[in-house]
């Protein structure tokens, strides 16, 4: 991400910042949050949410990692949101935090979460059925 000055204005006015976490934003987000002077968004504040909390993460290193090893992520693959189960964890984290920040709408957030979870589980069952003939097949991806 190439940070823009317009991000500072958005951060100054924000009630909640949801970060991918796993140090994906480490190169640009902390400085912007600091410059925004929005105390709610600082780590540990109610206005900051690391979406990765509670998610299962692949490729989490148990050894020392450095840049000489290439594009590695010491806290695991930051693309953790791609699994339906992690999608439920993330949505639950967001719903819970929104309910804390905006308690008058907590019932609305819980209702929307329940609907999202139901739809995601239905979709996941369809996807599992579609992919089951390929169980055990190796797949290579690149990005």
Model-based region annotation:
Residues 1-143:
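Extracytoplasmic metal-acquisition and chelation regions
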């Amino acid at each position: 991400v190439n940070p823009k000055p317009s991000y500072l204005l958005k951060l100054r006015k924000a009630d909640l910042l949801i970060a991918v976490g796993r140090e994906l934003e480490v190169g640009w987000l902390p400085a912007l949050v600091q410059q925004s002077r929005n105390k709610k968004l600082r780590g540990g504040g109610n206005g900051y949410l690391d979406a990765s909390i509670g998610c299962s993460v692949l490729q989490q290193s148990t050894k020392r990692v450095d840049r000489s090893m290439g594009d590695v992520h010491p806290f695991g693959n930051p693309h953790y949101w791609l699994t339906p189960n992690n999608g439920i964890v993330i949505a639950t984290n967001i719903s819970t935090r929104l309910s804390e920040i905006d308690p008058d709408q907590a019932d609305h957030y819980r209702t929307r979460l329940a609907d999202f979870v139901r739809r995601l589980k239905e979709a996941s069952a369809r996807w599992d059925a579609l992919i089951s003939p390929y169980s055990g097949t190796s797949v290579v991806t690149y990005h």
